[in-house]
């Protein structure tokens, strides 16, 4: 919305949110088409990472019924991902004992204190919040099966894997969905400035790689 209004020059967004914005999906919070948006580059994938306390009894998406679950800040990319995955799995927020709209860090603290049973976090692999949780309590990473991903009906959601040992205690690969992130700008930004920004990023990939593990997925072919 800020880019559409010309109140910024660059943003990082999930592919499904970008599609919703471009098409004016009111259910996702976009009452008008954001037709001034322009793509700059693909970056890295967000992975749907649903993590439960090992003693919660949660092993599948269906087991989330009757449980206390955090889905990220309201209307955030993570929360939109949660809605899409739950709907495809035949679940709704009303099926849960409690839904919390909390940032990653706060969700983890509540799980440590046994005030939440599970959290859904859409982020790069090895996200710090889940690494922190996994060192404090035993966790289970809940799979998102391929048939659920297909039912979402959005090409932005791709079948992917959270590799074994991404988190402490996670000894097996876990199937999930991944959603690409894109850098976007708007039509009012001069082409020369867009070129310089893009060039600067790709000439400094080593710096990005050193700053964040997820950035290693950014390649020139993006």
Feature locations, PLM:
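Structural recognition of the beta-strand scaffold that forms the well-ordered cores
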Residues: 9-14, 39, 49-51, 70-72, ...
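N-terminal (or domain-start) structured segment
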Residues: 1-21, 29-30
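Bilobed "Venus flytrap"/periplasmic-binding protein-like clamshell domains
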Residues: 1, 42-113, 205-206
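A structural signal for short loop-to-beta-strand junctions that line the ligand-binding cleft
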Residues: 30-43, 166-175
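Pocket-lining segment of extracytoplasmic ligand-binding domains
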Residues: 15, 26, 56, 93-190
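N-terminal secretory/targeting leader peptides
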Residues: 1, 5-7, 86, 114, ...
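Extracytoplasmic
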Residues: 5, 34-37, 45-47, 66, ...
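Segments of small-molecule ligand-sensing domains
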Residues: 172-222
């Amino acid at each position: 919305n800020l880019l559409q209004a010309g109140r910024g020059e660059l943003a990082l967004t999930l592919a499904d949110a970008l599609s919703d914005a471009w098409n004016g999906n009111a259910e996702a919070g976009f009452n008008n088409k954001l037709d001034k948006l322009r793509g700059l580059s693909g970056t890295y994938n967000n992975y749907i990472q649903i993590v439960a306390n090992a003693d919660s009894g949660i092993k599948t998406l269906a087991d989330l019924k009757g449980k206390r679950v955090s889905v990220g800040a309201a209307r955030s990319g993570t929360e939109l991902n949660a809605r899409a995955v739950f709907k495809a799995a035949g679940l709704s927020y009303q099926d849960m004992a409690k839904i919390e709209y909390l940032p990653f860090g706060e969700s983890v603290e509540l799980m440590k204190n046994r005030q939440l049973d599970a959290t859904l976090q859409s982020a790069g692999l090895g996200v710090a919040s889940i690494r922190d949780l996994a060192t404090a309590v035993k966790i289970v990473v809940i799979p998102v099966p391929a048939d659920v991903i297909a039912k979402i009906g959005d090409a932005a959601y791709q079948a992917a894997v959270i590799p074994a040992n991404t988190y402490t205690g996670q000894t097996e690969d876990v199937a999930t969905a991944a959603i690409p992130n894109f850098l976007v700008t708007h039509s009012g930004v001069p082409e020369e400035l867009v070129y310089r920004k893009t060039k600067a990023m790709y000439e400094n990939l080593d710096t990005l790689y050193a700053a964040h593990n997820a950035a290693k997925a950014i390649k020139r072919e993006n």
